[in-house]
Swiss-Prot record:
Its cofactor is Mg(2+). The gene is glmM. The modification Phosphoserine is found at S100. Binds 1 Mg(2+) ion per subunit. Keywords: Isomerase, Magnesium, Metal-binding, Phosphoprotein. Mg(2+) binds at S100, D239, D241, D243. This is Phosphoglucosamine mutase. It catalyses: alpha-D-glucosamine 1-phosphate = D-glucosamine 6-phosphate.
Amino acid sequence: MGKFFGTDGVRGVANEGLTPELAFKLGRFGGYVLTKDSERPRILIGRDTRVSGHMLEGALLAGLLSIGAEVMRLGVISTPGVAYLTKATSAQAGVMISASHNPVEDNGIKFFGPDGFKLTDAQENEIESLMEGEDNLPRPTGADIGVVNDYFEGGQKYLSYLKDTIDNDFEGIHIAIDCANGATSSLATHLFADLEADIYSIGSSPDGLNINDGFGSTHPEKLQEFVVEKNADIGLAFDGDGDRLIAVDEKGNLVDGDKIMFICAKYMHEIGMLRKDTVVSTVMSNLGFYKALENIGLNSNKTSVGDRYVMEEMRQNGYNLGGEQSGHIIFLDYITTGDGMLSAIQLVNVMRETGKPLSELADEMVVFPQVLKNVRVMDKNQALSSSVLLDEVDAVEKELGEDGRVLVRPSGTEPLVRVMVEAKTKEECEQYADRIVSVIEQHLGA
């Protein structure tokens, strides 16, 4: 990670860390790096529903226009919508203004290349290098200054594409949706209405301040109650920018990203669409996920935590399904990033094709109890290479055998070591996690 770019673009508290001045620079230098080979580059901009979106869009727009770009404003749209439309309209770049599932105070700016994929590390480094130096970029004048046009119908083009990924309608299926008062608030309602589902919605009345506030994929409790109250067949919870999906079965039980991936992987395998019989996930996926795949003869590849690492593995090795327990699920045959609405219609389509309720599909994967504990340390990297810790982890893994697992990893942002244990019972998880935590605190703690 660089000075400005993190694991998912540039993020910060809007008007403090992520200021209009910084947004202008990102537009000017980011736009230049992505479009320097084009005489009149076309760049798409989308945003979520945060109150700071207009402010940052205006500043970003000014930066892009200052390098002579033709900017197409998409208005409120999901992150995957921007990624899809960037490629579909042959634009030179796309930009999304969102902080995903973060609170309303935060915002972010994320770029996509002409292929619809996020930027490479090399591209981000080039942008940062220009931002930290003297501004010697060309400054067009007169008719060469950039122009801006609205392309609000882009959202409908994106929805039409999503519908074309399946052959069924959803007539007679009762669907409850929670849009986190975010980017999918209008889009998801239109999508499922067009597919003839019976829709009930919550979290679909954004006011600029209520995004992710008690609703959406990181707060599914209200949706669980709503599904039972409305006697719905399925609940679908999206996050603020629409790149995640967490589902709820007809009984009100959570169906997380692991279960959604398993359900879709099994169906794709049965119809011959799962490439190399493999699903890509992160090390945080539940042990039950791996065992369920193994039981039906499928393989799994593990990556570090983060959807960018899942995507790298998929692209490098030709896989077409991957994701995270948190609900980032990538169907690479269709789109170049995680997409909550695409994941949702693929999941509902499996219900339609199999005739099975979601609870029955989800119950084929048995979730192992899991405990996650954080321990503050002096040096997290030194702690992870400590022989005393490695010996204790090895001892616990031998005792667990194939009925559990241990994962010890550093926090990405704090001086913490995270200890995750999965086992057959919650009591075993607690017992083994406490053993490892005790060793860290005694020998390596802050």
